[in-house]
């Protein structure tokens, strides 16, 4: 292998590692933490959005209701809340991984009807 090819190969590996690093950070929480977060989703989120997430004080959070909404926007809403509404920000109690997990669960259609 020539020096140039070796350098390009190493650069490619470094770039791939850099691009995949955020995916490692976004790994799902441990199983015990997931159970805690699922409970929080049903009890805390469900107290405003309905136990089946079909709406109540807050809007519906069903898979259909969230269809087309950008994941990043949903994460920002859970993180910072919605000023002027009853929706609080959860960043004081939950970290980024927890919030991403909750949003992903809702996008997957949790809780199942």
Swiss-Prot record:
Entry keywords, A to Z: Electron transport, Heme, Iron, Metal-binding, Periplasm, Signal, Transport
Free-text description of this protein's post-translational modifications in UniProt: Binds 1 heme c group covalently per subunit.
Record's protein name: Cytochrome c55X
The organism of origin for this protein: Stutzerimonas stutzeri (Pseudomonas stutzeri)
Pfam (any one): Cytochrome_CBB3
Positions annotated to bind heme c: 45, 48-49
Region forming the signal peptide: 1-26
Broad class of the protein's primary localization: periplasm
Subcellular location: Periplasm
A GO term from the CC aspect: periplasmic space
The protein's role, per its UniProt record: Monoheme c-type cytochrome.
Molecular-function GO term, any one: metal ion binding
